[in-house]
């Protein structure tokens, strides 16, 4: 049993090196802090990420994959900056800069390009609802009509991960990524009045056809 767990942890170590977002985080840290300091911070981030992964239990394969490739690297970055010689305000600013400029803007650009596809709204709404309905990343309710679709998320893996890793305050930045990603699109409108990350009892996504 012990050998099995050691091998599993070894595979995680190898997996971390191949996570695409890790390359993005390293590049960001080097640009912001310079080669020497940025590389040192990234090394610390990798160690923290490894610990976060090893301490994550009772998750499905799909949830674990999403945590490793998407959520935990950002939590590890946040915890790395908290341990650096930075003020809380600076830590927030660095994380906000990363989440908005490195993550959200690229997601928005990718979504905007998809709008060029004929019947984009019909396709996107159908896929979005199907994914949310079948995925174990959220606990949600869906409602839809001809020109709109709503998703009320009562639980989401992003918020859960932040709570479980003692950084619930970080979750609001994950929510901000959604606002940038879906804001200002030409064929789909997006509104939301509350989120789990900002202290609400749910995330009330409302999409509508423009």
Protein language model regions, located:
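N-terminal, charged low-complexity regulatory/assembly segments
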Residues: 2-81
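Amphipathic, alpha-helical segments enriched in basic
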Residues: 4, 48-52, 56, 66, ...
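Hydrophobic, Leu/Ile/Phe/Ala-enriched alpha-helical segments that form helix-helix packing faces
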Residues: 29, 81, 128-132, 178-181, ...
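Short coil/loop linkers at secondary-structure junctions
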Residues: 34-36, 87, 168, 188
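Residues embedded in well-ordered secondary-structure elements
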Residues: 66, 140, 194-196
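Amphipathic interaction/junction segments at domain boundaries or subunit interfaces
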Residues: 69-75, 79-165, 170
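C-terminal non-catalytic interaction appendages of large macromolecular assemblies
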Residues: 147-150, 155-210
């Amino acid at each position: 049993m012990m050998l099995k767990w050691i091998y599993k942890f070894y595979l995680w170590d190898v997996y971390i090196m191949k996570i695409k977002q890790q390359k993005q985080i390293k590049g960001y840290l080097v640009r912001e802090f310079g080669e020497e300091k940025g590389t040192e911070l990234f090394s610390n981030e990798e160690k923290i990420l490894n610990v976060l992964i090893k301490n994550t239990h009772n998750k499905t394969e799909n949830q674990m994959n999403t945590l490793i490739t998407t959520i935990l690297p950002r939590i590890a970055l946040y915890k790395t900056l908290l341990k650096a010689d930075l003020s809380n305000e600076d830590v927030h600013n660095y994380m906000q800069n990363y989440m908005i400029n490195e993550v959200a803007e690229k997601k928005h650009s990718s979504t905007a390009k998809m709008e060029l596809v004929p019947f984009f709204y019909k396709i996107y709404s159908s896929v979005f609802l199907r994914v949310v309905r079948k995925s174990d990343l959220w606990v949600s309710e869906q409602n839809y009509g001809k020109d709109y679709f709503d998703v009320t998320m009562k639980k989401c893996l992003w918020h859960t991960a932040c709570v479980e890793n003692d950084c619930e305050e970080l979750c609001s930045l994950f929510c901000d990524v959604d606002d940038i990603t879906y804001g200002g699109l030409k064929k789909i409108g997006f509104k939301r009045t509350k989120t789990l990350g900002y202290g609400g009892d749910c995330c009330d996504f409302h999409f509508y056809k423009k």
